[in-house]
A protein has these predicted regions:
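Acidic, metal/ion-coordinating pockets
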Residues: 1-262
Length: 262
């Protein structure tokens, strides 16, 4: 199970509350969430990580907002379940991938950021290629999940096809809107351009809508954005893999809030 960007307290508390039942209902072996917006919409803290882990999260991925809460710099150096984008500079604290030993086998999670309309980072295609060459799906590793935190749809789609047949799931994050293109690619990799956010969709991508709308209309600075506090929708994707580690089944998850549920 993969859940998209958690935005703010209301979404965080709903994920913590609902995740145990979701894991039981869907017989989930491994749960991943993107937590980069979980602290008031900006970054993540040690306490939030611990709450998510306690609720049943196995791995937390992030993105460009990771360092918005500076306390996480020390924590990430000693917590291998919390990932930062793998194409950050090599001396950056933390790791961009981890191999998890589970009862069902080894699961490799890779967190990578795109470069189109984003920060200038190392080439995500090259870095992912190196990791997949050294960790072959179905031989060295039983399942591989890649979180592509990127702005451009084209870059996410291209990365999906580039990894097709070499990963179990390639799923996009960052734009906070779930796409309707969940599919199994030609060579067996599950794919969705964006998992969407876990947050209140009566908002502007998770933020209380008054200030973002005002800024678009008036083109002037104003108050700090704050997460919307209405009923959150839990958004993500669930896959089943076969003995080769490829995707046999993929389905979107939307639960609660103003979006239609799956």
């Amino acid at each position: 199970m993969y859940l998209g960007d958690i935005v703010g307290r209301a979404a965080r508390e709903k994920v913590v509350r609902e995740l145990p039942d979701l894991k039981s209902e869907y017989l989930v072996d491994f749960a991943i969430v993107n937590g980069e917006n979980s602290a008031g919409g900006f970054g993540i803290t040690e306490d939030i990580c611990k709450d998510l882990f306690s609720s049943g999260v196995d791995c937390i991925t992030t993105g460009n907002h990771l360092w918005d809460q500076r306390e996480i710099l020390d924590f990430i150096s000693n917590e291998d379940r919390l990932l930062r984008p793998v194409n950050f500079p090599s001396h950056t604290p933390g790791s961009g991938f981890n191999i998890f030993e589970t009862e069902k086998g080894k699961i490799l999670v890779i967190n990578v950021m795109g470069r189109l309309f984003m920060d200038p980072l190392d080439d995500p295609f090259r870095i992912i290629d190196e990791l997949l060459i050294n960790n072959e799906l179905g031989k060295d590793i039983d399942a591989i999940v890649i979180d592509v935190h990127a702005e451009a749809t084209s870059e996410k789609v291209a990365l999906g096809h580039y990894c097709d047949g070499r990963a179990s799931l390639v799923v996009g994050t960052h734009t906070h809107i779930p796409t309707a293109d969940h599919q199994i690619l030609q060579f067996g990799t599950g794919y969705q351009t964006d998992a969407g956010m876990c947050g209140d969709y009566d908002s502007v991508i998770g933020m209380e809508k008054t200030e973002p709308v005002r800024r678009f209309v008036e083109k002037t600075p104003g108050n700090r954005f704050s997460p919307a506090q209405g009923d959150a929708t839990i958004c993500g994707v669930i896959i089943e893999t076969n003995d080769d580690g490829l995707c046999d089944k993929i389905e979107p998850l939307r639960l609660g809030g103003v979006l239609s549920s799956t």
